[in-house]
Amino acid sequence: MNRFRLRGTGVALVTPFKNGKVDFDALENVIEHCIRGGVEFLVSLGTTGEAITLNPKECREVLDFTIKINAGRLPLVVGFFGDNDTARLTEKIAHFDFTGFDALMSSSPSYNKPSQEGIFQHYMKVAEVSPLPIIIYNVPSRTASNVTAATILRLAHASEKFLAVKEAAGDMVQAMQ
Protein backbone atom coordinates (compact mmCIF):
# COMPACT_ATOMS: atom_id res chain seq x y z
CA MET A 1 0.00 0.00 0.00
CA ASN A 2 2.26 2.87 1.14
CA ARG A 3 5.98 2.80 0.52
CA PHE A 4 6.97 4.06 3.97
CA ARG A 5 5.92 3.71 7.56
CA LEU A 6 5.30 7.15 8.93
CA ARG A 7 7.35 7.50 12.08
CA GLY A 8 8.89 10.33 13.97
CA THR A 9 8.42 13.99 13.31
CA GLY A 10 6.35 15.28 10.44
CA VAL A 11 6.09 18.91 9.44
CA ALA A 12 2.96 20.57 8.12
CA LEU A 13 4.36 22.78 5.39
CA VAL A 14 3.31 26.41 5.14
CA THR A 15 2.29 27.68 1.72
CA PRO A 16 4.12 30.97 1.21
CA PHE A 17 2.57 33.76 -0.86
CA LYS A 18 3.97 36.74 -2.72
CA ASN A 19 1.68 39.38 -4.22
CA GLY A 20 -1.38 37.17 -3.65
CA LYS A 21 0.05 34.13 -5.45
CA VAL A 22 1.81 31.00 -4.22
CA ASP A 23 5.53 31.73 -3.98
CA PHE A 24 7.01 28.50 -5.32
CA ASP A 25 10.62 29.61 -4.82
CA ALA A 26 9.91 30.19 -1.13
CA LEU A 27 8.01 26.88 -0.92
CA GLU A 28 11.04 25.08 -2.33
CA ASN A 29 13.18 26.72 0.36
CA VAL A 30 10.73 25.61 3.06
CA ILE A 31 10.72 22.02 1.80
CA GLU A 32 14.52 21.86 1.56
CA HIS A 33 14.91 23.44 5.01
CA CYS A 34 12.60 20.82 6.55
CA ILE A 35 14.39 17.95 4.83
CA ARG A 36 17.82 19.25 5.87
CA GLY A 37 16.48 19.68 9.40
CA GLY A 38 15.90 15.94 9.70
CA VAL A 39 12.13 15.57 9.72
CA GLU A 40 10.78 12.13 8.84
CA PHE A 41 7.78 13.13 6.69
CA LEU A 42 6.06 16.17 5.18
CA VAL A 43 2.40 17.21 5.17
CA SER A 44 1.31 19.31 2.20
CA LEU A 45 -1.82 21.45 2.37
CA GLY A 46 -2.83 20.85 5.93
CA THR A 47 -4.42 23.67 7.90
CA THR A 48 -1.05 25.44 8.00
CA GLY A 49 -0.75 25.02 4.24
CA GLU A 50 -3.69 27.33 3.50
CA ALA A 51 -5.61 24.70 1.49
CA ILE A 52 -8.93 26.29 2.34
CA THR A 53 -7.81 29.59 0.79
CA LEU A 54 -6.59 28.06 -2.48
CA ASN A 55 -8.70 27.11 -5.47
CA PRO A 56 -8.52 23.50 -6.76
CA LYS A 57 -5.98 24.37 -9.49
CA GLU A 58 -3.69 26.08 -6.98
CA CYS A 59 -4.00 23.13 -4.58
CA ARG A 60 -2.97 20.70 -7.30
CA GLU A 61 -0.04 22.94 -8.30
CA VAL A 62 1.21 23.06 -4.69
CA LEU A 63 0.88 19.29 -4.32
CA ASP A 64 2.62 18.53 -7.62
CA PHE A 65 5.40 20.98 -6.81
CA THR A 66 5.89 19.42 -3.38
CA ILE A 67 6.12 15.95 -4.94
CA LYS A 68 8.67 17.22 -7.47
CA ILE A 69 10.90 18.99 -4.94
CA ASN A 70 10.70 16.16 -2.39
CA ALA A 71 11.73 13.73 -5.15
CA GLY A 72 10.91 10.67 -3.06
CA ARG A 73 13.26 11.61 -0.22
CA LEU A 74 10.57 11.59 2.48
CA PRO A 75 7.08 10.17 2.81
CA LEU A 76 4.40 12.71 1.86
CA VAL A 77 1.00 13.23 3.44
CA VAL A 78 -1.74 15.16 1.68
CA GLY A 79 -3.59 17.10 4.31
CA PHE A 80 -6.65 18.86 2.97
CA PHE A 81 -9.28 16.17 3.42
CA GLY A 82 -11.77 17.61 5.86
CA ASP A 83 -15.36 18.57 5.14
CA ASN A 84 -18.60 18.92 7.04
CA ASP A 85 -20.33 16.83 4.36
CA THR A 86 -19.21 13.19 4.43
CA ALA A 87 -20.67 12.40 1.00
CA ARG A 88 -18.88 15.35 -0.61
CA LEU A 89 -15.61 14.40 1.10
CA THR A 90 -15.76 10.76 0.05
CA GLU A 91 -16.54 11.85 -3.52
CA LYS A 92 -13.47 14.11 -3.46
CA ILE A 93 -11.30 11.26 -2.16
CA ALA A 94 -12.69 8.79 -4.70
CA HIS A 95 -11.71 11.06 -7.61
CA PHE A 96 -8.42 12.41 -6.29
CA ASP A 97 -5.07 11.46 -7.82
CA PHE A 98 -2.95 10.35 -4.85
CA THR A 99 0.12 9.51 -6.94
CA GLY A 100 3.20 10.54 -4.98
CA PHE A 101 1.53 10.50 -1.57
CA ASP A 102 1.82 7.92 1.20
CA ALA A 103 -1.09 8.91 3.45
CA LEU A 104 -3.90 11.41 3.77
CA MET A 105 -4.85 13.48 6.78
CA SER A 106 -8.50 14.11 7.50
CA SER A 107 -10.23 16.19 10.15
CA SER A 108 -13.64 15.40 11.57
CA PRO A 109 -16.65 17.29 10.19
CA SER A 110 -16.55 20.97 11.03
CA TYR A 111 -19.44 23.13 12.19
CA ASN A 112 -21.97 20.25 12.44
CA LYS A 113 -20.77 19.15 15.91
CA PRO A 114 -21.37 15.43 15.31
CA SER A 115 -21.66 12.93 18.13
CA GLN A 116 -18.85 10.42 18.67
CA GLU A 117 -20.94 7.90 16.73
CA GLY A 118 -21.29 10.42 13.90
CA ILE A 119 -17.53 11.00 13.90
CA PHE A 120 -16.94 7.24 13.85
CA GLN A 121 -19.32 6.74 10.90
CA HIS A 122 -17.75 9.68 9.04
CA TYR A 123 -14.24 8.26 9.34
CA MET A 124 -15.39 4.76 8.41
CA LYS A 125 -16.83 6.17 5.16
CA VAL A 126 -13.48 7.89 4.53
CA ALA A 127 -11.69 4.57 5.14
CA GLU A 128 -13.98 2.79 2.67
CA VAL A 129 -12.91 5.02 -0.23
CA SER A 130 -9.36 6.00 0.68
CA PRO A 131 -6.63 4.17 -1.23
CA LEU A 132 -4.11 5.36 1.37
CA PRO A 133 -3.64 5.08 5.12
CA ILE A 134 -5.37 7.83 7.09
CA ILE A 135 -4.10 10.20 9.75
CA ILE A 136 -6.97 11.31 11.95
CA TYR A 137 -6.65 15.04 12.60
CA ASN A 138 -8.32 16.03 15.86
CA VAL A 139 -8.53 19.81 15.89
CA PRO A 140 -11.60 20.83 17.91
CA SER A 141 -10.70 24.52 17.75
CA ARG A 142 -11.41 24.36 14.01
CA THR A 143 -14.10 21.68 13.84
CA ALA A 144 -16.10 22.41 17.02
CA SER A 145 -16.02 18.71 17.93
CA ASN A 146 -13.45 16.63 19.78
CA VAL A 147 -12.56 13.12 18.64
CA THR A 148 -12.21 11.27 21.92
CA ALA A 149 -9.55 8.68 22.64
CA ALA A 150 -12.30 6.05 22.83
CA THR A 151 -13.48 6.90 19.31
CA ILE A 152 -9.93 6.84 17.97
CA LEU A 153 -9.36 3.43 19.55
CA ARG A 154 -12.65 2.18 18.10
CA LEU A 155 -11.61 3.38 14.63
CA ALA A 156 -8.18 1.74 14.95
CA HIS A 157 -9.84 -1.59 15.78
CA ALA A 158 -12.40 -1.23 12.98
CA SER A 159 -10.00 -0.60 10.10
CA GLU A 160 -6.30 -0.99 9.38
CA LYS A 161 -6.51 2.19 7.28
CA PHE A 162 -6.10 4.35 10.40
CA LEU A 163 -2.38 4.93 10.70
CA ALA A 164 -1.93 7.78 13.16
CA VAL A 165 -3.49 10.73 14.95
CA LYS A 166 -2.53 14.37 14.78
CA GLU A 167 -3.76 15.43 18.21
CA ALA A 168 -4.41 19.17 18.39
CA ALA A 169 -7.03 19.34 21.14
CA GLY A 170 -4.60 21.06 23.48
CA ASP A 171 -5.42 18.55 26.21
CA MET A 172 -2.36 16.70 27.49
CA VAL A 173 -4.48 14.18 29.40
CA GLN A 174 -6.32 13.26 26.21
CA ALA A 175 -3.06 13.15 24.23
CA MET A 176 -1.58 10.71 26.75
CA GLN A 177 -4.57 8.38 26.37
Q: What do these predicted regions represent?
A:
Residues E128-V129, P140-Q177:
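Catalytic alpha/beta core domains of metabolic enzymes, predominantly
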Residues N2-N146:
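Active-site beta->alpha loop and helix N-cap motifs at the rims of alpha/beta catalytic domains
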